[in-house]
Amino acid sequence: MQSPTNGVSTPKDFSSARRSIQFQNTGFPQIGLASARRHTPFHHAPSKRRIPQTSPLSETVDPLKIALLLSKQWTLYSVTPMHKFSYTNLKEYARLLSAHICAEKQKGLAVEVGTELNVKATFSPLPGLKGREQDPGSILIQVLAKPQFSAAGAQDRIVWSGCFCCTFADEDTLDLLTSETLLCLPLFLVNGAEALTAMVGTWFQKAFDCSFSNLPISSRDLAWMAAMWTGYEAHEHITATEFIFSVPIEPHMDISYAIHPEDIKALWSNIHKGQDEVLAEEVDLLFQCLYTHFFRHFKIHLSATHLVKVSTSVASAHCDGKVKFLSKEYLLQVLGYLTELAINNIQY
């Protein structure tokens, strides 16, 4: 294993925390949700996690739309089941959401500097973006606008994107959270201005009686991500695995710990022996080895810090709920893990 490529960073201002988007709670009905909580392991730390089998993206998925998901920073939200949402009414939903955004803009709410009131929303089904056949189909939402003073015939540009997903969801949990009138798409990915996010979220809450919550990622879940993603055989975007640790001192400092992909892969191969699942003990052992190696070089106990970011060849994730998908090959597997976190984050 190579020595870490980075040491302790310079102090930085930590006073500005990320603002949380707060949506209006429309009083989501409790039908079926209490029983779901009683019979499913919500918020319990798992002792093992199943490794989703590699499944290529369906040919029904538009490659251009999949490309829109890659290499962008997405903010994560969890969403309660939507009441009376229909895949057959997407055009009508697009019309209503467009009207809602334009109405909010006319009230003086800023959407984006340099755009006209001519804003429109589109809803696109992504039926192939699923890990199993029984997973609900994903929905891509885009908000488009013409730049101010643009030439005649200029194309609209995308100013905001959002995607509802439910990939590799636990079948028993999914059965409990869905019905003839409830659709469970618990993971919501957002790329765009916070003002537009609030407008879209508010409209969905009023239209489908659902509620949104920020989806932070705990240090423990980041550790699971690092272990599970290290085991994937990436072929298209191979980079060093990097960990960012937050040091609980003032002024605030971060520690960056980068490891060659072959080194961490070899370490994980010596630890992980199963084919279908990853054990919590294996995750613990991986980080014990990393901590020991780092202490040998810098005499710093990383166990006294907080893991806040993980970057691998497959994806990167930050504790404040920011994610980048870096591999089309393993997009479904990453979405599957995030779907699990989103379901566990739903408040009842």
Curated annotation (Swiss-Prot):
Keywords from the UniProt entry: Centromere, Chromosome, Nucleus
Keyword Nucleus: yes
InterPro entries named in the record: CENP-L (IPR025204)
Matching PANTHER family: CENTROMERE PROTEIN L
Protein task: Probable component of a centromeric complex involved in assembly of kinetochore proteins, mitotic progression and chromosome segregation.
Cellular component per GO, a single term: chromosome, centromeric region
Protein name, per record: Centromere protein L
Superkingdom per UniProt: Eukaryota
Main location: nucleus
Family: Belongs to the CENP-L/IML3 family.
Subcellular location: Nucleus; Chromosome, Centromere
Lineage: Eukaryota, Metazoa, Chordata, Craniata, Vertebrata
Stored Pfam families: CENP-L
